[in-house]
Amino acid sequence: MNEPRRDSGFFQELARRRVYRSAAAYAVFAWVAIQAGSIIFPEFGAPAWAMRALIIIFIVGFPPAMLLAWTLDFTAKGFTRTPESGYTVAKGIWPKLAIAGVTTAMSAGVLWWVWDDYIVQTRARPARALVKEQPVVAIQEPRYLAGQSEEEWLGDGIATLIRSELAESQHVIVISRARWHEIVSEASTEDEIAELARGIGIDYLIDGELFETPDGIVLTTRIEDLENGVEILSPRTSGANVSEIIEGVVQLSTEIKRALRIPHQERVGLFEADFAIENVEAYEAYIAGLAYLVDFEYQEAENAFNAALGIAPDYHIARFRLAQLYESTGRSELARATLDRIPPDANLSKRLQLYVEGAKAYFVAQRDPGKAIEVYSELVGLYPYEVEAGQLLAEAYWLDFQDSAAIDEFRRLSEIHPYDPTSWMALGERLLDVGELDEARVALEKFASMKPGDAFAFALLGNLALQQGNFDIAVERHKNALELKPDFVVARIGLARSQYLKGDAGAAESAWRSLLTDDSVAAAYRIDSAFDLAGVLRGRGQFDKALGVIEDSMPLIREEQLRAPLALSVQGSIYLDKGDAERAETLLTRAFQEAPAPPTRFLFALGMMEFRLGHATELDETIAALRLLSDSNKPDRNEDKAANYLAGLSALEENDLGSAASLLQAAVEEPGYQYRLYRTGLAMLSRAAGDLDAAAAIAFRAATERDRGDLRLDLEIDRARALLLHAEILAELGADGEAKKQARRFLDWWRDADPALPEPARARALLDD
């Protein structure tokens, strides 16, 4: 006879009735069901409360399940009532009440935690706001959750596809890839990324995770409303391989656009995604090229784009980016040839077609600023919030000498993208170029505040100080930039210019020459340095050295094309300074023949040669040709200024002082660009008229004055000659002491000048007197 034992306790009774095992099984089953629900519910469009309901059901069901486990046992014969033990007989109903009480208390606690920390908190959040008319959206590359993977590039590739799809719409502002990488470069966690995005005014952040499973790859995605702190979409995409994941991104992009309320008619052709699905390896190489390009690793980017084209020769997006790379590194002919390999019927979206068409007009080879303005205006009209399109339009205006239109476009970009430091940087840089230093300071300080410790910010502030005449500060700012980024070419050029104007010509020349011989520096910057150094050497009477600098740089200049006529013109003018009229005429004529329209600068250089050589008839023809180029509808009067200066010098030579006065005054006062220091002509006129006081004042101003918007180192030769003219006029006034002081200053400038030049002899004659 089996009598119930009386020596068992409550916990032993739980074990005998298999309550522990039942609780564990219940927990495992609930966990599996909840995990399955998290995958299945989104696929079937289940409402957000469905998952919460499932969790609550399992919590509430726990006490009844444990009571059943206490009461019933599952055997081979099915469910049977668990026999009583001595413990339960002795305790009566109390064990049942205990198990019910404990499980109910546990369930109530968990339920309260879920309710208070999740459901109530969720309900307490602000309701999802309506999507803004033009929301600002950033796309963060999905992260791989399980460490390294052979497909690490895929997150970047997915983000690029989504970014490209959204950028095709007029109804959303998409943060560019390069700009987004700048924003999150210092962030290490998801919270930091979201906080940085929220801090600069981004409305929605799209991010997610990638992980590999035995069946393939899974991509989870989220759209976070950063302002309201809610998640508005969390789709899930899976595929057996990379191609299937990329194909899933097509549908994902549609869901994202729907969530952002992008109108149906604005949905984009899936050109890039379609190509990537069929050419995964080429797309991987293309993504690598973009990453290298962001980091200015041009050779690696070039290799990657060429690899993409080697795999898929009709990958025209990669071809377009390769052409841009060639153009930015000074290989204009190659850039144009690469663009020409993109057929008119290439399978590109309208947006990308316009970028290609605009580049054909914008690139140096066969440049047509008017056509570029037309194409980029259409692009901006279709996509008014796209930063790259607006910046290209502004630069096209700049190339067409429409400075005001260019700056207005940069202002527009800074107004609609106030969160973007590059908009403030571009605006400040162009304002510096036109001498609007006060507004430039505001823009550059805004840029610097958004990018503290940035090398480019220091360099531009150094350029601002340089143009303000604060040379010590300029040197310091450029050195700050180089401490942060030792090879930063903008700061290297700025430091050379600052050192020169501060009076340290030796250090400046060394800096320029180091740029000229540095193959890692982009060709455009090396050419800038060549013209800077040639202008300074010419201004100090070192004509042979100046010619050598230009001659050594001609391979780069010829490859770039744009400044080849300018180089010929500079060489011809220097040979004219040296008295070699034959070579001067040959070079200046070639410069004019190769010049792009309008050839104002090169006609003027020919006119100066004709004046110096006394070729009056040819000079009159050149002046007439300049006047024919004048356009009364344009605000600048470059052609009229140049013609008036040449005609004024000719009248002065013929002693027609009345005509010379009106012509030279107009040359100085009319708005526009000057190809020489026209004010020197006025000083010569006043001297010829016997007004020596006025002549001295004008000559001094010509020797010392600099344009706030342009340092014009090419005019150093005119400043030196104006200084010598000032010294001679002072001597005629009887101010011998001051005349000798200015003569010594000139001779100090020209201490290394080429021998047998007439100017040093004139200065020494003043000292002898």
Regions found by a protein language model. Give the residues of each.
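Helix-start (N-cap) detector for alpha-helical repeat units in TPR-like alpha-solenoids
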Residues: 282, 316-317, 349-352, 369, ...
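Residue-level recognition of tetratricopeptide repeat
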Residues: 290, 324, 359-360, 395, ...
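Catalytic-center loop of serine/cysteine hydrolases
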Residues: 91-92, 97-103, 107-130, 156-300, ...
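An N-terminal, helix-rich hydrophobic module
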Residues: 1-117, 314
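Register position in tetratricopeptide repeats
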Residues: 294, 328, 363-364, 399, ...
